[in-house]
Amino acid sequence: MKSDMRYIELNGVHRDEYLITFEDIDPNYRLSLTSALAYFQNSVAAFMTDRHIAAFDIRPEGFLWVISEISMKLSEKSPLWREKLVSEVKVSELTSTRAYFDFRLMRENGEEYASGTGIWSPVSLATGRPVQ
């Protein structure tokens, strides 16, 4: 993999802002779990895009990213439709085969709604196996 993970600079925190829209809510007008996870995935993808290692950057080299695990803690009350949220992602650990991303999703006032960790691994399109 030309974008060898051992030599990629993955420091810093990436922040995104989200406005909860109709497609992001459950029947009670609150942010759905699926949407919270989508914000996590989208923020990690933006983090990788800024560093030129997003899926569309590594696909021509014969690789893609696979999410192998996500764990997330949620506060009791989900944000409501039209609330603004801020996400933060950062790499907490990097190995030759995995990138561990920590995630936070906060309300505008800074109150944390969700936090968690996910594992992303580059996989060879030819073999379907993780890149070593």
Annotate each predicted stretch with a short phrase.
Residues 1-67, 124-132:
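Hot-dog-fold acyl-thioester-processing enzymes
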Residues 3-7, 11-16, 71, 79-132:
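HotDog/MaoC-like acyl-thioester-processing domains
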Residues 47-95:
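Hydrophobic beta-strand-centered segment that forms part of the acyl-chain substrate-binding groove
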